[in-house]
Amino acid sequence: MPQKMCANRQQNQIAAGVPCGRATGARDILVSNLRLVRWLRPAPAGGSRGSNMTVAADTIQAVEAVFTGRLAAGTAPGSSWAVFDRGGVVAAGGSGDAELGGVGGASAGPETLFRIASCTKSFTAAALLLLRDRGLLDLDRPARSFVPEFSPEVPGGFDVAPTLHMLMTMSGGLPTDDPWADREESMTREAFRALLTAGVRCTSVPGTAFEYSNLGYAVLGQVVERVAGMAFTEFVSREFIEPLGLDMHFERPGDEGAAVATGYRRADGEGWRALPFTGPGVFSAIGGLFASARSLAEWAGWLAAAWAGDERGPLGSASRREMQQLMRVAAKRPSAAPANGTPAPPVEPAAVLPLVSGYGFGLFVEHDERFGPIASHSGGYPGFSAHMRWHTASGLGVVALENATYAKVSQGAEQALRLVLAAAERRSPVTPAPVPWPETVEASVALSRLVVDWSDATASAVLATNVPLDVPFEERRSAIEAAWLDVGGRTAESATPVDARCDSPNHLVWFLPGVSGRLRVEVRMTPLAAPRAQTFTVKVDGSAASGA
């Protein structure tokens, strides 16, 4: 049944904050705080973090089944996961073994510490933004302004020095280096200085292309140290981990009571082989943190809360939103097959490639065709796999950790978040629709009357000065009359708009019924405080436009 729109109804909806084309009951995804199950969260301190999302018990069971299914398929000895929103952890769980065999064997749970590897890069980026916001550095300055020994060789003889911004967005021209860099965490400052002095190479001109570089983030870690005057690990702990109350560490906790997962790799014919831990060093900035699923979800939820204007914590919401903006587009590459005979993890059959993906500051950003922007990061270290991802519009997210090399837990996290978002969307759209300005609605009512009964005076009162310059009023009136003839003429309902929709507060599209068809009308307002219609088009639904 067509949706009728009138000025009073539209303006009443606008006053109530209702998106264009939606009923008043669908404004919020959820209206209560159902909190699961075995792990409950306290109310957030220091103010609201935006709407808390309810995730039903059957959805959480489906999420848990994703990760238990992965373990049954042999992807890792153990796993831990959490579902979160802007208010914190909604539900969390774990299964399998954090440590295999022996007296110290233990089960994995949401408090178990795993290496989160490259998820640490979000802390490195946040540290640089914090220093920038304090006026201590400029992201557009060359990195060698802070680390003089970093002067990479650029192909083609171009005289371009990678800036902090380029390195932060994975466009510094440096080559992908995961296997090598993952083994260099403990490198000393002296060894790193010697490495850079000996020279490094770029594979592309800095600032021109995406290529994921750990070396670039190790350089950024040194920038933090030299500007802040303290070790990178100390700065991140002091400025972020401690103020936010996160259970995270750059060294394996020495407390015997601490639950720490052991990392494993699958050895041919030998099953799982335990791998040694590495200690902090220069490459801690690329992936050095230990974190639990709960604490990583708290961090991700705090980043997600920036979209609700949450100003708690050390970094302002504007800078946290900046981290989650796509700044460098990346080509979607096929995933490599797991090595050493590790079974391929189950993949959601309905998985959809993003429309576009790339890198922000310490985070990947992708645009999902169904749900819109998703922020994420994966982490892979010898013996560990980590992933965090969230839907920026709703704040719903998933964290997942496994203790095996090449486990690719990102696949499970992607599937789990789609389950959570799909369940939420069955109750109400998870991506809010834009709400038209009152002036946009008023213009649509006046222009609907104008289309039925043209008046130059009415047109002059509603339309911006460019409109008659683009197409004169007389030409517009004639084109509109021709359009009415194409749909069999006017009816008593022709001045009543139906099926209104918008893509921005200054925009509306609606339809006016005729005898045998309908006209499509579109308006887009100017950006002024007292806006007028700068775009006004009328056409037969399905035909070419008759105005501009």
Regions found by a protein language model. Give the residues of each.
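Short, gly/Ser/Thr-rich active-site loops of penicillin-recognizing serine hydrolases
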Residues: 334-336, 372, 399-475, 544-548
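Short, surface-exposed loop or secondary-structure junction motifs
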Residues: 88, 98-99, 155-375, 380
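Short, conserved catalytic-motif segment at the N-terminal edge
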Residues: 54-116, 136-138, 149-153, 189, ...
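Short, well-ordered beta-strand elements
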Residues: 387-390, 394-404, 520-524, 533-540
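Short solvent-exposed beta->alpha transition segments
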Residues: 457-503
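Short active-site loop at a secondary-structure junction
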Residues: 69-82, 102-167, 203-215, 284-287, ...
